[in-house]
Amino acid sequence: MLVPKRVKHRREFRGKMRGEAKGGKEVSFGEYGLQATTSHWITNRQIEAARIAMTRYMKRGGKVWIKIFPHKSYTAKAIGVRMGSGKGAPEGWVAPVKRGKVMFEIAGVSEEVAREALRLASHKLPVKCKFVKREAE
């Protein structure tokens, strides 16, 4: 699972996700990609589930690039704990994904296989996605 090796601060502010992604909006490594059309936090477990769904469908053929990394921690308090008395303990890691960001890329397989693999991966994610191709240069 994807987690940072070390971080400067264990607990972070939630922050806001306004607007579109600034970078990473085009397919750069592979031939096909999965682009987010809405903004959301994506956990390291969701990223791993999407990766497994893609690689199993492709039967270990082709190459997959994961272009997002869960660098932001999120906290949670235990169930039944009253309000106050500090911020909760770190619960997991998330990648804040804005709309327009290409999250996964695939190369080395046909378009039909890539389209289906990315469709299966999109069902594991909390964002609406669309299939994109590399722009002809």
UniProtKB/Swiss-Prot annotation:
Single Gene Ontology MF annotation: rRNA binding
PROSITE patterns: RIBOSOMAL_L16_1, RIBOSOMAL_L16_2
One Pfam family here: Ribosomal_L16
Alphabetized UniProt keyword annotations: Ribonucleoprotein, Ribosomal protein, RNA-binding, rRNA-binding, tRNA-binding
Cellular-component GO terms for this entry: cytosolic large ribosomal subunit
Coiled-coil stretches noted in the UniProt entry, renumbered to this chain: none
InterPro entries given in the database record: Ribosomal_uL16 (IPR047873), Ribosomal_uL16_bact-type (IPR000114), Ribosomal_uL16_CS (IPR020798), Ribosomal_uL16_dom (IPR016180), Ribosomal_uL16_sf (IPR036920)
GO terms for biological process, alphabetical: translation
Superkingdom, taxonomy of origin: Bacteria
PANTHER family xref list: 50S/60S RIBOSOMAL PROTEIN L16, LARGE RIBOSOMAL SUBUNIT PROTEIN UL16M
Subunit structure: Part of the 50S ribosomal subunit.
Function: Binds 23S rRNA and is also seen to make contacts with the A and possibly P site tRNAs.
Family affiliation: Belongs to the universal ribosomal protein uL16 family.
Name by which UniProt lists this protein: Large ribosomal subunit protein uL16
Species of the source: Streptococcus agalactiae serotype V (strain ATCC BAA-611 / 2603 V/R)
